[in-house]
């Protein structure tokens, strides 16, 4: 009898022990679960928010939900904007590094071909200084169509938002037109002389054709179309180009190239030749790309003043080379 009672007590003890252990484990598990669910919002604030929600009308609840959604969307937009900005900064840094390397290797920076100070200086040269340059560059020209001795009839131009008034006349020399156009429109005479040489080699031509004078600055003469007759003639080309540059300044947003931004600039009219992102550093360089929308590829730069490959274009490369040869570094 005593033995049976002892065994029963032992079984009860074992049973009780298991139950106690289970309870202990359950308490630990419960504590862990509670810890996992612990809110980051303070208890008092949770209670206040709950009371506010419970007391709110349907309209107020809808307003609270809408406010929360708007705040969430705004936060997401801010984060997305920051991500884009950081990505843009990385792209700009990479573009600037590539441009710096090109400048070191070839003395050409596609993002800073010429400084604003050098470009927008309408008093860079006097009429006499322009004539001296024409005489020097055209020293081997002896015919009756040399730019240094040619004269033209010019038309008076009223002042407008782009240029000051230009007083026309009979038998104006090329030097007078270049000086007066640059002075009226605030464009460097050095730039105008450089473009005349870049586009039609008029400064050094020994027997220039009528077409060279008609399209002297390449104004409204795209690579893939005929020239606009409205701008034909030496005066129309020189004065028109100076005015067009100022038009570009005031309407830059209408064009594809912008200062202080990354711009994709192609190497060639053929899109298959590719291009690269260029961080354009100033307005003058942006205007050159609006006027001539291509950059030299590496083959063109390696060639110096020579020819590159089938994808090479030379307009902006030649601008830098010609300007530098006559007037020094265009970036100074």
Labelled PLM ranges:
Residues 2-11, 17, 23-28, 33, ...:
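Non-catalytic cell-wall polysaccharide-engagement segments
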Residues 114, 118-179, 184, 191-193, ...:
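Peptidoglycan-targeting cell-wall enzymes and recognition modules
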